[in-house]
Structures are given as structure tokens and as C-alpha cells.
Amino acid sequence: MNMNFIRKLPIPLELKTEMPVSPALAAVKAQRDAEIRRIFTGESDKFLLIIGPCSADREEPVMEYLRRLRSAADAVLEKIFIIPRLYTCKPRSAGDGYMGFIHQPDPNEAPDIFKGVAAVREFHLRALKETGFSCADELLYPENHRYFSDLLSYVAVGARSVEDQHHRLTA
């Protein structure tokens, strides 16, 4: 198989250094993670609701959705803990077609995973900054988790990936 090397992806630490999570935002995420842990372990009687669009491929409409969801989440906080879905990968059974924001952050340009990884990190960082939500994402590529581990509160393994040994070992 012939491949053309275009450029090296940054290592996760490089990207985290370029786009850091502030101490204040890290505290917000830690608090949310602790609440999720309490729900999963039964220490909290709250329901956990992971909700959102199938694909987060257009930033502004998703941010508008998150702002509205923030109001709803605040209204039900005593009974329901909400984690928004901000799914940036689109698994494809046939392997072709649009594969999500991580592959093609600008639909008017050619796919570019280098730009995509940075765009996804910025997207999750913006969600946390502007709404206080640490989100859920389906990581089609388990190794990408290291780019977003300080931002995500929930990571999903999708239906097309459950039989993949790499995903199962990562989970």
C-alpha cells in the first residue's frame, strides 16, 4: 500500500500545552466527574442523562444547544445530572462518507485530521468554558483519548466498535 506522508500529528502533551485547561475549569470538570462517580456507585440517587445530537459537526448550533441545555440542566439538578453528547466522530460501516469533525473540521476543505484533533479539543474546551459542561464523546480511535482526557467526563464505545479488540481493551 502506498501512502504519502503529509505531516506528523502533535503528541497529546503538545496539544494540551497549546490549549490548556485552566485550573478553574479543571476544578469544574473534577466536580462533575465526582458527581458522575457518585451516581455510578449508587452514592447519589440522581439519574444520569447523556443527551445530545448524533453528530456535533457544526460548532455554533451545538453551542446554542448547549447553552439552552445548561438552563434545563440547572432546573433539574436535584434529580437529574446531564452530560451533553458532543460526538465528533462518525463511524461508517462502509468506510466512506463524512467521518466527522475530527476528520474534516471545515466542510468546505479537504479532510485534515491534524486540524481536526485541534478543532475537537478547542470545541470541548469551549463547551466547558462557556457552559460549564464537560461532555461525552464517542472516541472512534481509542488512542485519541489522550488528546481529550482532561476535558471529557464520559467516553462512549459505539455500536460499530464493540467487537474491536482495541476498543474492548481500552474500555
List each language-model region with its residue ranges.
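Glycine-rich anion/phosphate-binding loops
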Residues: 56-76, 110-123
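Active-site-facing alpha/beta catalytic cores
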Residues: 7, 79-171
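Conserved, mostly hydrophobic/aromatic
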Residues: 52
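Acidic (Asp/Glu)-rich catalytic clusters
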Residues: 40-43, 70-77, 125-130
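N-terminal start-of-chain detector that recognizes signal peptides
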Residues: 19-23, 55, 107
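N- or domain-start disorder-to-order transition segments that initiate the globular core
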Residues: 2-43
